[in-house]
């Protein structure tokens, strides 16, 4: 149920005044279709652990993938069968089939076949190609044939998430000789995340989240991370009990061109005649011109070392007298050169 909130209460400050990373960086040094290292910073203290652990659980449990769910082997009625001229018994073959990693390029389940003549190993790559099924680990051995017999099997490939025990499958849907298999659907093989400190200006009390993801190749690591974030977002939306647009502050309708025409933008911040404390804070933050200053938000200014609410109010009052405000985007504005400043 949507709750009405008093518009006079600036509840938006709860999320507006938290620092937020602009993007997720990808470490390209070892990046591949199966491995990715991602860096997200800066985050508020404690947020890296919260986000890192939440995404890790979702990555391992909820990202969908494809797996073999049933097998029908010619000459075998059940999983305890031993087959002539096959080194492994059916139970061992089933264990090997569980490790086959696949990519399913359609929504419906698919049936694929193996027809391999011995002697020699039968590998995942011997599965007859299909337009919708792609084998990711083709060298994976399924069994070994000791004669020139032909090994024939029919496999069912389905979508799913997490782990599905064989006994959970509907027995009424199985045909004679069709054996259900424990299915490992998750395409994510390994996840590791590290939380360290991040610096913003002179402050180091922020978090840095470094994520390493390894997949089976059916899903790219960056896509798996994106899907997990989407799942988390969808699950959390239900907790927001107010109209988000109604509580956001009104954006001042100021055209960029009008702002850029303001003559004060090219003036040095010394012209503001600030207090010594405020002036030193701007100098330490490498804010030299008023055009630099107005592009900073309230939140960014308050993160500056030794810069407090009193200094912020002082600056906002002076900018208001110039018909300027903080948090303005100036596209195409560049700080004047030394020669221009002298003129």
UniProtKB/Swiss-Prot annotation:
GO terms for biological process: DNA-templated transcription. It comes from the Bacteria. GO terms for molecular function: DNA binding; DNA-directed RNA polymerase activity; protein dimerization activity. Homodimer. The RNAP catalytic core consists of 2 alpha, 1 beta, 1 beta' and 1 omega subunit. When a sigma factor is associated with the core the holoenzyme is formed, which can initiate transcription. The keyword Transferase applies. This is DNA-directed RNA polymerase subunit alpha. InterPro entries: DNA-dir_RNA_pol_insert (IPR011262), DNA-dir_RNA_pol_RpoA/D/Rpb3 (IPR011263), DNA-dir_RpoA (IPR011773), RBP11-like (IPR036603), RNAP_asu_C (IPR011260), RNApol_insert_sf (IPR036643). Residues 1-243 are annotated as: Alpha N-terminal domain (alpha-NTD). It is an enzyme of class 2 (transferase). Its EC number is 2.7.7.6. The N-terminal domain is essential for RNAP assembly and basal transcription, whereas the C-terminal domain is involved in interaction with transcriptional regulators and with upstream promoter elements. Keywords: DNA-directed RNA polymerase, Nucleotidyltransferase, Transcription, Transferase. DNA-dependent RNA polymerase catalyzes the transcription of DNA into RNA using the four ribonucleoside triphosphates as substrates. It catalyses: RNA(n) + a ribonucleoside 5'-triphosphate = RNA(n+1) + diphosphate. HAMAP family: RNApol_bact_RpoA (MF_00059). Residues 261-343 are annotated as: Alpha C-terminal domain (alpha-CTD).
């Amino acid at each position: 149920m949507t709750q009405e909130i008093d518009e006079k209460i600036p509840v938006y400050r709860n999320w507006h005044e938290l620092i937020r990373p602009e993007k997720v960086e990808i470490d390209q040094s070892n990046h591949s279709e199966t491995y990715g290292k991602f860096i997200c910073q800066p985050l508020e203290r404690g947020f890296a652990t919260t986000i890192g652990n939440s995404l890790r659980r979702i990555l391992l449990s909820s990202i969908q993938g494809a797996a073999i769910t049933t097998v029908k082997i010619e000459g075998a009625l059940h999983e305890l069968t031993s087959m002539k001229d096959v080194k492994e018994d059916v139970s061992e073959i089933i264990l090997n089939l569980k490790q086959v990693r696949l990519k399913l390029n359609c929504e419906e389940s698919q049936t694929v076949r193996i027809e391999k003549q011995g002697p020699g190993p039968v590998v995942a790559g011997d599965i007859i190609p299909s337009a919708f099924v792609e084998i990711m680990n083709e060298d994976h051995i399924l069994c070994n044939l000791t004669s020139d017999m032909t090994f024939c099997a029919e496999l069912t490939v389905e979508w799913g998430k997490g782990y599905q025990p064989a006994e959970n499958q509907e027995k009424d849907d199985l045909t004679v000789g069709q054996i259900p298999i424990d299915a490992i659907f998750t395409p994510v093989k390994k996840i590791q995340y590290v939380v360290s400190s991040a610096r913003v200006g002179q402050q180091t009390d922020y978090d840095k989240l470094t994520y390493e993801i390894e997949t089976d190749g059916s899903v790219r690591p960056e896509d798996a991370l994106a899907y997990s974030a989407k799942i988390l977002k969808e699950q959390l939306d239900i907790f927001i009990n107010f109209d988000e647009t109604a509580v956001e502050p009104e954006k001042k309708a100021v055209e960029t061109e009008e702002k850029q025409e303001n003559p004060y933008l090219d003036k040095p911040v010394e012209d503001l005649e600030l207090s010594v404390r405020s002036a030193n804070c701007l100098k330490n933050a490498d804010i030299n011109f008023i055009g630099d200053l107005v592009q900073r938000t309230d939140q960014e200014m308050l993160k500056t070392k030794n810069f407090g609410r009193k200094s912020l109010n002082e600056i906002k009052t002076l900018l208001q007298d110039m018909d300027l405000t903080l948090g303005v985007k100036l596209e195409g504005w560049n700080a004047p050169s030394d020669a221009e400043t002298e003129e």
